[in-house]
Amino acid sequence: MAASAEGCIFCKIVRREAPASFVREDAFTLAFMDIQPMNTGHVLVIPKAHAEYVEDLPAGSAGPILEAAKEVSRALRASGIRCEAVSLYLANGKEAGQEVFHTHMHVIPRWRGDGLGLRVRADRGRVADRKDLDNLAAKIRAAMGRSRK
């Protein structure tokens, strides 16, 4: 693991050893305002237990993260904060954009023209070959259950 629970800023927030502006909390998750928001109202939802990557989460603990994000999303829309839509984003690894190595889901208020977006490759519009898709699906199925380590 790149960051131990001891040195992890999100774990420090869970233990109330670092400041945060809390939005919601339950037995498994904690939601708080992102200190470097992409848009006003940007919230992070984390599991209270340290897990660097989503695949490190114990069985059954990913669901509460999405449930918390769903509740935050609903509240953002009703809050009066500018929010025409909501992006849910989870970066899983450095190359995916993960900066804090404690699994977390971004709940980001969105509106037309906010300047945020997912950049896609120029060839994104092509339709993939079914045989290639079937081969990729088979590789992923074969890897199910194997550890990341």
Regions of interest found by a model, annotated:
Residues 1-149:
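HIT superfamily nucleotide-processing domains
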